[in-house]
């Protein structure tokens, strides 16, 4: 984003980014071309390219927006917890709550993770994001929460990377379950996940 952007230009970027999230969630990453995103935004493709330069830069903006909205939900919840178990529970409940309030964002970031290949083979995790987002990510990182629990004796000796992967997989499965069955009970699922993982981590 150019530092000299006007308020109107910033608003247009935000609109295009929102339309890109919707298009990727609805059509899939491969089918969400710049032209289709432009059509959804009601602008010419040249307008999208004026604001973002190329699709890779647009995708980077989408990723940053998805992370920003996710961390807005998760950071306060995790920070409010006083124990590792509380932080783990808050992480799970907040992320599943995000699926409820921002379903398109979660589907879009998953689509990008599975399908995006930028210039030089760049993947989702290689895309540049605002340094503040990296700071927020560290505050809710599962490996950190689990490692802290092990260090303090609150959790049993465990491999934080393995348990973190299992938690992420379980949260991701909730997204697919909700797509298949819009009535899927995310709150009940959150209760079950919290119970299962706190039992799995208990000393």
Residue ranges, per PLM feature:
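N-terminal intrinsically disordered/low-complexity leader segments
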Residues: 1-11, 22
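Short hydrophobic clusters on alpha-helical segments that form packing/core surfaces
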Residues: 16-24, 95, 197
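C-terminal peripheral helix-coil segments that are non-catalytic and often amphipathic
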Residues: 1, 94-97, 136-152, 156, ...
């Amino acid at each position: 984003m150019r530092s000299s952007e006007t308020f109107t230009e910033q608003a247009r970027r935000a609109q295009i980014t929102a339309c890109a999230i919707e298009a990727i969630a609805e059509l899939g990453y491969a089918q969400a071309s710049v032209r289709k995103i432009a059509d959804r935004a009601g602008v010419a493709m040249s307008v999208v390219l004026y604001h973002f330069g190329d699709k890779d830069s647009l995708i980077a903006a989408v990723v940053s927006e998805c992370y920003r909205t996710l961390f807005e939900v998760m950071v306060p919840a995790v920070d409010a917890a006083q124990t590792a178990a509380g932080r783990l529970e808050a992480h799970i409940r907040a992320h599943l709550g995000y699926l409820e309030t921002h379903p398109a964002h979660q589907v879009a970031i998953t689509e990008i993770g599975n399908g995006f290949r930028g210039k030089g083979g760049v993947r989702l995790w290689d895309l540049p994001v605002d340094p503040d987002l990296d700071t927020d990510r560290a505050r809710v990182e599962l490996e950190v929460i689990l490692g802290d629990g092990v260090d303090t004796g609150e959790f049993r000796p465990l491999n934080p990377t393995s348990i973190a992967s299992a938690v992420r997989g379980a949260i991701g499965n909730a997204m697919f379950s909700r797509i298949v069955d819009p009535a899927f009970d995310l709150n009940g699922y959150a209760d079950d996940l919290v119970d299962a993982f706190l039992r799995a981590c208990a000393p």
